Every structure is written in C-alpha cells, then in structure tokens.
Amino acid sequence: MNKFLIIDGLNLVRRIYAAIPDENDMESLKERVTSACTKLLRVHHPSHIAIVWDGDEISWRKQLYPDYKKGRKPMPEPLAQGLRALQEHLATLNIASIYAAAEADDVIATLAVKTAKAQGEAIIVSTDKGFSQLNHPRITQWDHFNQQYLDIAALEQKLGVDRSQFLDLMALAGDSGNKIPGIAGIGPKSAAELLKTFRTLSTLFSSLPNLGAKQAKKLAEGKEMARLSYKLAQLQTDLPLNINLKDFRANSTPHPAPNIEQ
C-alpha cells in the first residue's frame, strides 16, 4: 500500500525559521529543515513524499472575498530570498516540490484525497487545522512540532461539534485566523449550540421560525455571508494535478527530484 507523506511547505519552514535567532542565517534554516524532513522520513517510512508550496498568484478565495487572510504578515525578506535555494537543496534529498499557483492547501487536499481513494494512506504534515475537514479513514494529519497526530476527538470536544460539522461551524462563526467572516453576532459557542440542535446549515435555515426573533433575524440577514464563508473554508479536493506518482517515490539514496509547477 502506498503511503504518501505530504508536507505543507511554508507551514513547516516558517515555524522553523521563526525559531532561528539570526533571520539572515539561511544555513541554519537549511540544516533544521533537513533535520525535520529526515525525522519525518524516519518516523513515518513513507513510500512517497512531496512538499507543497504556496504560489504568488492571487487565490480564488481572495478574488471572491478580498479581505480573506487580510492583515497577515508578509514573508520575511531573507526567507523569501533564500527559499528557492532551500527548495533546490530538498530536491537533492529526493524530496520533490510541488508549486501551487496560489494556496498550497487545495493541492495538498487533492493529493490526500486522491491517495486515499486509490486505497493508499495520506499523511498531511501541517499544524493547520483546516485539514481536519478531510474526513477519511486513510487521511491523517501529523503535527511535526508536537510529534503527534491531530486528535480529532479532542478537537470535536473543544469546538463542541462533530467533525462532519466543522465547515458548518466556520460558516456560522467564521475563522479569525483566515479572516473568514461568518455571520455577524454569531460566535463559536452559539454556533455550536445551534448545530447541536439543528445538525446542519440547511436544517437550521429552514427552522428560523422556531428561533427567537433576534437570533432568527441575525441568521436570516447573514445567510449569504454564511454561504460565502462555507465556500471560503472548504478545501478543493478535485484539482487536475498533472503529476506522476513515481516522481515522488521516497528512496534511501538521495538523488535530484523533480520540481513540479501547478
């Protein structure tokens, strides 16, 4: 059975970079990223490995909602200048890069789902909990920094909803980290309570007459924003990826791996 280790490139590298005392020390970054990737290979023993990078194009999400991810700090200039050399170094370790046109998340999600549907196992290396919506028994998420798999049961308990409701929760309450708006006046706790009662967005919006006038008014006025928020939060899992699985085989003997543009 294929086991595909899919690394969220900037999620890994920016966290490692943030821990380096000298922001211009690209050699230390290269050493630490190499060490992290070596450890990932040793821990998981994948048959295939890829590291997926964000691209420079404006994402379809930002085109749809210009405030999406607004206010995020830009990549530090030394890291931006040294990133290509790091990617080329990883290729010599047989870790192929995939360059997304815009956001890496949709490419990662598509790779994971395609692997799972082909009866393989996909392990996403990222701390981004947005991947938790990929509800498939052969897709898991690994937090390299805490050396543990994402605990879905603990996340369900923290959020107060089932995994199948994660997207509905973000549609109602939004996601401050990504500047996904949700419905004004509906916070995470009230959204979770509504979903406990009504289970789905469609049932909730068809049941507004059963709610108090004030809350029903908020929901009715925010219905279109909830739909937009759901779309922004939902990962695309069916992108046309022109790749060949053999290009991502993990070998013990390092050799240059292809860098694949999407």
Curated annotation (Swiss-Prot):
Domain 5'-3' exonuclease: 164-251
Pfam family, one: 5_3_exonuc_N
Sequence segments annotated as region (Interaction with DNA): 185-190
Keyword Cell cycle: no
Keywords, sorted A to Z: DNA-binding, Endonuclease, Hydrolase, Magnesium, Metal-binding, Nuclease, Potassium
Residues given in the record as Mg(2+) binding sites: 105
Signal peptide segment: none
SUPFAM superfamilies attached to this UniProt entry: 5' to 3' exonuclease, C-terminal subdomain, PIN domain-like
Family as reported in the entry's similarity comment: Belongs to the Xni family.
Name of the protein in its database record: Flap endonuclease Xni
Organism: Shewanella putrefaciens (strain CN-32 / ATCC BAA-453)
